[in-house]
Swiss-Prot record:
Function: Involved in phosphonate degradation.
Classification of source organism: Bacteria, Bacillati, Bacillota, Bacilli, Bacillales
Modified residues (N6-(pyridoxal phosphate)lysine): K194
Nucleotide-binding as UniProt keyword: no
Pfam family for this entry, one: Aminotran_5
Protein's gene: phnW
Protein name, UniProt field: 2-aminoethylphosphonate--pyruvate transaminase
Length: 365
């Protein structure tokens, strides 16, 4: 239980702790040595969360939403003569395709249904057939549905065929254990307001140093030039090129400390996993079925199929908001769904309160 006006059962922005909010009550200077030292600590902590082989990787922080960081990677990493293979089964994979097209990058798509994971057989077929592909991108947890994609297999194939690997781990990093060195990920992207439980305002890229160094001069945007942003942070002890979200950075630093206190990524995963299992079991008791097969379901967010013809999501949303909960509408076109997030400062008692509210007639009645 927390002191928020509403409990956000969403995939980010999400419900944060009181202590994360409190550090934003103060003002900070972007040129201050103490602040820039904190930025460097944040960068180092992110690398240590991502891999045991810390010397091979570095972190770049980028102002804006997570999408800004994804576009920074797509626009800075792929050369003019490069070609990108995007594995997509939801809105965020499609967004990467849209970015590539807007940036006039050659792109090929491996498309699967939104409730099915990336098809590894098709990915390999495309890699075999198209020798011009230089980079491969995949979304780890596609929050359109809550499905988990097989990034281990995708990245293994990418390296087998000599490609640079890009993983959008926006909604999974910090909540699902991975080692980017073991998985051979060259660029991993996430955001402050997801599983680490900070607030919106910046994203980050954890990059293999060798690959990042190849990006010098390739940026297609001034403000989203990944290499230039990294070089400034490296040479000027945590300085951002342009005004940084100081309050958000302090909140994120506090959130990192709280992740460590909770027991790290494994402990947080266990909490999210237990939240999700409890949610599905209890929702099942009152007639709601999840969209995604259990073996592909993430612990991050769950899509539920409308229980009957004539079901009104807006009624559900409005009534649950009266009970103190905020949830998400569906985001797929072929099946009517709504979504409930399991992440943030959310615990089993919160899930029970939510389902109790629904069972009392907050939705159907």
């Amino acid at each position: 239980m927390n002191e928020n006006h509403y409990l956000l059962l969403t995939p980010g922005p999400l419900t944060t702790t009181k202590s994360v909010k409190e550090v934003m009550l103060y003002d900070w200077c972007t040129w201050d040595v103490e602040y820039n030292t904190m930025v460097q600590e944040v960068r180092a902590k992110l690398v240590s969360l991502a891999t045991k082989e810390e010397e091979k990787y570095t972190t770049v922080l980028m102002q804006g939403s997570g999408t800004f960081s994804v576009e920074a990677v797509i626009g800075s990493v792929i050369p003019a003569n490069g070609k990108l293979l995007v594995c997509t089964n939801g809105a965020y994979g499609k967004r990467i395709v849209q970015m590539a097209e807007m940036l006039q990058i050659d792109v090929v798509v491996s498309q699967t249904e939104e409730w099915e994971p990336t098809n590894i057989v098709e990915v390999e077929k495309l890699l075999q057939e198209d020798k011009e592909i230089t980079h491969i991108a995949v979304v780890h947890c596609e929050t359109t549905t809550g499905i988990i994609n097989p990034i281990v297999d995708v990245c293994k194939l990418g390296k087998q065929y000599g490609k640079v690997t890009i993983v959008d781990a926006m909604s999974s990093f910090g909540g699902i254990e991975i080692d980017i060195a073991d998985l051979q990920i060259d660029f991993l992207i996430s955001s402050a307001n997801k599983c680490i439980q900070g607030v919106p305002g910046f994203g980050f890229v954890i990059a293999k140093r060798d690959e990042l160094l190849k990006c010098k001069g390739k940026g297609r945007s001034l403000s989203l030039d990944l290499y230039d942003q990294w070089e400034t942070m490296e040479k000027q002890n945590g300085k951002w090129r342009f005004t940084s979200p100081t309050h958000v950075v302090h909140a994120f630093y506090q959130a990192l400390l709280e992740l460590e206190k909770e027991g790290g990524v494994r402990a947080r995963y266990n909490r999210y996993y237990n939240n999700q299992k409890l949610l599905v079991n209890r929702m099942g008791e009152i007639g709601f079925k999840p969209l995604v097969d259990e073996k592909y379901q993430s612990p991050i967010i769950t899509s539920f199929i409308y229980p009957k013809e004539g079901f009104e999501f807006q009624q559900l949303y409005n009534e649950l908001k009266r009970y103190g909960f905020v949830i998400y509408p569906g985001k797929i076109s072929k099946v009517d769904t709504f979504r409930i997030g399991n992440i943030g400062d959310v615990h089993e008692e919160d899930i029970n309160r939510l389902v109790d509210s629904i069972a009392k007639g907050a939705v159907i009645g």
